[in-house]
């Protein structure tokens, strides 16, 4: 055969080697042409045989019909032909089978030859026959039929190494060649969990490897405690994400990964549970760590599928602050929010998005309610709410989902909101001395904390929250009327409202500072609000929660700038309060932009004193409110009215902390979780999922007796109006 030229050893002179290779190439071309001609002849003969058989069948059928006088069915004519090999039809069928076999053997020879001429250069010499492994089930017979096949295998390594495009010959059947190539590439892609296919099409430049550090790899774990944890480790942006992937690329990646992890994603309109939801599960917790941007709508869609999206309030607040600051200052900050493009409408910072979804028999009802806002608005609006301080209709849908979840959870969150108010009161103390750098660090770390989980103090006081919730559910209703409703963290806007307008604005600016620098340069207020917010998470609940707040502050310090001293813990408690204030502040900032901010604060101050915080928390997603709400509020309620104004404003100023406080899956943020848990408090150390499970399932705690429907309605109205921020919550509720 053509390939039987002697194998060239490396010692052969280059001139002789080139001539031999050229000769080999010519021989291969000639052999290919011969095989192609044989294949063409065999195909023509096969077609002729088939036509002949058809004619014979029709002829026999006609004869039988004439003989019998009636067509008794096409079956009878076929039977004798199939049973009698001597009949012309039987002989034709046998010839057809032989022709098909010979044609297949010729095709396999040609394929082997092509792989020898083009595939040897792709493979090491030790594996010359790799192409024969997958594509041809009948390759064995082909090898037997081709006497030169063994020599082909032996000589294949000596074939030319020129690129495939250089060889003039073209495969007779491109499909055969492609079939041969595919199996070679498949094993590697299958072995690697994240193949380019899974990540979806990347229209533009692909993100740098350090930016998508782990590749877009999603780990979905079914936890024994009844929660599903989906951790997106791959889309986490590193500090130098300025050159990060564009929104379109990220959208494609996130969409592919989400679809892959969730399986069959179902729209909000579909009543049945998604395939990834199992009946016995009470809580589904999804942590999105990735690059922020308009592409969040993909994740938002998945969240809607899960019946409601609980996004960590702190992260939303941070992003609101970042975007408002960008609009006002037109510059991107060093914080994670500012790492990406500094455009006012786009935020490309790293975010950790924790979705906590409560699954219950109310699934259908909640899904239908989620439809109150158009699906498009939900998908596009949720990300916008997360990304920027520009309130949008999407936020309304986002909040509607939250309200649905809240209904499932019952009044749990109302109690938490009340606790939030108390926490804020306790953490009224503000530390103006903290520096902007520290605030920025805190903001960045707060973002991470988002998914890490609520502070241990919050977990510990979850039951207390329930008790306070029942007693203070009414207060939460009042608060809803009085307090501004942030799409994510209503509680914080309430705090802001309670404070004087001037202080509110200052604190809001302060909360913006950590993310995007203060609008007015009031760094001290921002620091104060952040510090107070930090305390709010752990300390507001009780005086005893001071220890918890210290632990939480330590966590904050670890993330913010390593401020771990006990003195700083005291400051940290203040920071917690401030951070809660920051959570409100994003909305207050929005109010500033809209011009209604000042108006809202005075009106809401009075109402908020009564219990605006409680309702704000109710309106806010259970996860977001949980962080602050978890603190026991019964003790703090007494202090709430006097301290609320200060604490609330501070809470609004420190937006990032609420997110941190907000529960994140215990292992949500790979790095963040380790930082967040406070070793001091065993309750805090408990995984957030447990807390969430208890909070999400009203059955775990006695359901409050006061009418939840009205409160939910108030929360819904509040949430719907919250994103717009153009009218105060009290006016909206009225």
From Swiss-Prot:
Record PTM text: Palmitoylated on Cys-728 and Cys-730 and prenylated on Cys-731; which is required for membrane association.
GO cellular component: cytoplasm; plasma membrane
Keyword Cell membrane appears in the UniProt entry: yes
Chain residues in the propeptide: 732-734
Subcellular location: Cytoplasm; Cell membrane
Protein name (Swiss-Prot/TrEMBL): Paralemmin-3
Residues where lipid is bound covalently (S-farnesyl cysteine): 731
S-palmitoyl cysteine lipid sites: 728, 730
Gene name of this polypeptide: Palm3
InterPro entries: Paralemmin (IPR004965), Paralemmin-3 (IPR024149)
GO molecular function, one term: ATP binding
Residue ranges, annotated region (Disordered): 62-100, 114-217, 297-347, 374-400, 413-709
Coiled-coil ranges from the UniProt annotation: 19-64, 90-116
Chain positions found as Phosphoserine: 139, 158, 167, 170, 172, 270, 332, 335, 451, 601, 721
Keyword list, A-Z: ATP-binding, Cell membrane, Coiled coil, Cytoplasm, Lipoprotein, Membrane, Methylation, Nucleotide-binding, Palmitate, Phosphoprotein, Prenylation, Repeat
Function noted in UniProt: ATP-binding protein, which may act as a adapter in the Toll-like receptor (TLR) signaling.
Family: Belongs to the paralemmin family.
Any one GO biological process: regulation of cell shape
Residues modified to Phosphothreonine: 311
Domain of life where this protein originates: Eukaryota
Modified residues (Cysteine methyl ester): 731
UniProt topology in membrane: Lipid-anchor
Comp. bias intervals (Polar residues): 186-198
Quaternary context: Interacts with SIGIRR.
């Amino acid at each position: 055969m053509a390939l039987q030229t002697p194998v060239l050893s490396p010692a052969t002179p280059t001139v002789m080697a080139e001539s031999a290779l050229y000769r080999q190439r010519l021989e291969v071309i000639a052999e290919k042409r011969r095989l192609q001609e044989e294949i063409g002849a065999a195909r023509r003969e096969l077609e002729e045989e088939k036509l002949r058989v058809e004619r014979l069948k029709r002829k026999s059928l006609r004869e039988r019909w004439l003989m019998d006088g009636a067509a008794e069915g096409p079956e009878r004519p076929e039977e004798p032909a199939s049973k009698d090999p001597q009949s012309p039809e039987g002989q034709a069928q046998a010839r057809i089978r032989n022709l098909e076999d010979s044609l297949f053997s010729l095709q396999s020879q040609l394929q082997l030859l092509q792989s020898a001429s083009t595939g040897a250069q792709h493979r090491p010499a030790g594996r010359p026959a790799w192409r024969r492994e997958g594509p041809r089930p009948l390759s064995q017979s082909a090898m037997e039929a081709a006497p030169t096949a063994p020599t082909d295998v032996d000589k294949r390594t000596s074939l030319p190494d020129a690129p495939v495009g250089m060889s003039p010959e073209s495969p007779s059947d491109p499909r055969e060649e492609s079939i041969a190539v595919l199996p070679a590439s498949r094993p590697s892609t299958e072995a690697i969990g994240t193949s380019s296919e899974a990540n979806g099409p990347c229209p533009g430049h692909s993100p740098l490897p350090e930016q998508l550090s782990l590749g877009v790899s999603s780990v979905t774990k079914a936890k024994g405690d009844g929660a599903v944890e989906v951790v997106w480790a791959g889309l986490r942006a590193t500090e130098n994400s300025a050159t990060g992937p564009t929104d379109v690329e990220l959208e494609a990646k996130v969409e592919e990964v989400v679809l892959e992890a969730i399986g069959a994603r179902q729209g909000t309109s579909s009543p049945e549970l998604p395939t990834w939801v199992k009946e016995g599960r009470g809580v589904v917790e999804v942590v999105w760590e990735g690059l922020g941007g308009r592409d969040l709508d993909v994740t938002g869609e998945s969240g809607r599928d899960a019946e409601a999206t609980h996004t960590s309030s702190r992260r939303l607040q941070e992003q609101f602050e970042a975007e408002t600051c960008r609009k006002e200052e037109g510059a991107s900050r060093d914080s994670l929010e500012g790492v990406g493009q500094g455009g006012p409408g786009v935020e490309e910072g790293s975010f950790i998005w924790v979705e906590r979804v409560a699954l219950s028999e109310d699934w259908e009802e909640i899904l239908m309610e989620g439809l109150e806002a158009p699906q498009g608005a939900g998908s596009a609006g949720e990300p916008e709410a997360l990304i920027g301080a520009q309130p949008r209709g999407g936020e309304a849908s986002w909040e509607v989902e939250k309200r649905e979840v809240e209904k499932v959870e019952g009044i749990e969150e109302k109690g938490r909101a009340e606790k939030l108010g108390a926490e804020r009161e306790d953490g009224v103390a503000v530390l103006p001395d903290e520096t902007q750098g520290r605030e920025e660090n805190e903001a960045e770390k707060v973002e991470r904390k988002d998914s890490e989980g609520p502070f241990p103090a919050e977990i510990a006081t979850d039951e207390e929250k329930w008790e306070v919730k029942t007693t203070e559910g009414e207060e939460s209703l009042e608060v809803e009327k009085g307090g501004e409703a942030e799409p994510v963290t209503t509680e914080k806007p309430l705090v802001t409202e309670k404070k004087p307008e001037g202080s509110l604005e200052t604190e809001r600016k302060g909360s913006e500072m950590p993310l995007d620098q203060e609008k007015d340069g009031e760094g001290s207020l921002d620091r104060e609000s952040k510090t107070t917010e930090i305390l709010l998470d752990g300390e507001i609940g009780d005086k005893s929660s001071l220890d918890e707040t210290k632990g939480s502050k330590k966590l904050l310090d670890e993330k913010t700038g390593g401020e771990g001293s006990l003195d700083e813990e005291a400051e940290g408690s203040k920071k917690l309060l401030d951070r809660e204030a920051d959570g409100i502040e994003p909305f207050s900032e929005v109010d500033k932009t809209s011009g209604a901010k000042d108006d809202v604060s005075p009106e809401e101050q009075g109402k908020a004193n009564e219990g605006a915080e409680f309702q704000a928390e109710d309106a806010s997603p259970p996860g977001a409110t949980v962080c602050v709400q978890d603190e026991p509020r019964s003790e703090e309620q007494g202090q709430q009215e006097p301290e609320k104004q200060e604490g609330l404003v501070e809470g609004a100023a420190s937006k990032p902390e609420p997110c941190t406080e907000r529960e994140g899956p215990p292992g949500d943020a790979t790095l963040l979780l380790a930082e967040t848990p406070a070793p001091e408090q065993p309750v805090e150390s408990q995984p957030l999922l447990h807390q969430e499970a208890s909070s999400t399932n009203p059955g775990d705690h006695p359901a409050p007796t006061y009418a939840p429907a009205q409160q939910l309605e108030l929360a819904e109205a509040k949430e719907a109006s919250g994103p717009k921020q153009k009218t105060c919550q009290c006016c909206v509720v009225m």
